[in-house]
């Protein structure tokens, strides 16, 4: 019994780093954006996808493969809320991990990506 408790405590100490990364559905993502209108909204798709498929109003485009080299474009406060999305929810997982590696601690990621957002008939913007 004592061994189990020791391993449980060790696991918690080793793997609980305090980072917050939450994968949410469309409605929860939308509610979080409404509740936190000043949060940083990050689109990690490509420029071509941004232009072709539209984007969420107010989003900043930084492709997931460029996050580390363009880190100066991210919020200076590592605890600031970041709303994060990609096309389908795959690249945003990689991007969330990169953001955590960069020290960010408060990330809400749209698990269905913009595809799920559009399928739910939510609004998107198109560049002119």
State each model region's role.
Residues 1-32, 38-40, 47-81, 87-128:
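Rhodanese-like catalytic fold shared by cysteine-dependent sulfurtransferases
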């Amino acid at each position: 019994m004592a061994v189990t408790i020791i391993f449980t405590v060790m696991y918690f100490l080793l793997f609980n780093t305090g980072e917050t990364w939450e994968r949410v559905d469309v409605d929860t993502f939308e509610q979080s954006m409404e509740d936190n209108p000043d949060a940083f909204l990050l689109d990690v798709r490509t420029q071509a996808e941004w232009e072709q498929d539209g984007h969420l109003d107010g989003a900043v485009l930084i492709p997931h493969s460029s996050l580390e080299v363009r880190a100066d474009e991210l919020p200076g406060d590592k605890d600031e809320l970041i709303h994060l999305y990609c096309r389908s929810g795959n690249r945003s997982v990689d991007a969330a991990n990169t953001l955590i590696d960069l020290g960010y601690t408060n990330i809400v990621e749209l698990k269905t990506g913009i595809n799920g957002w559009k399928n739910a008939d939510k609004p998107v913007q198109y560049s002119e």
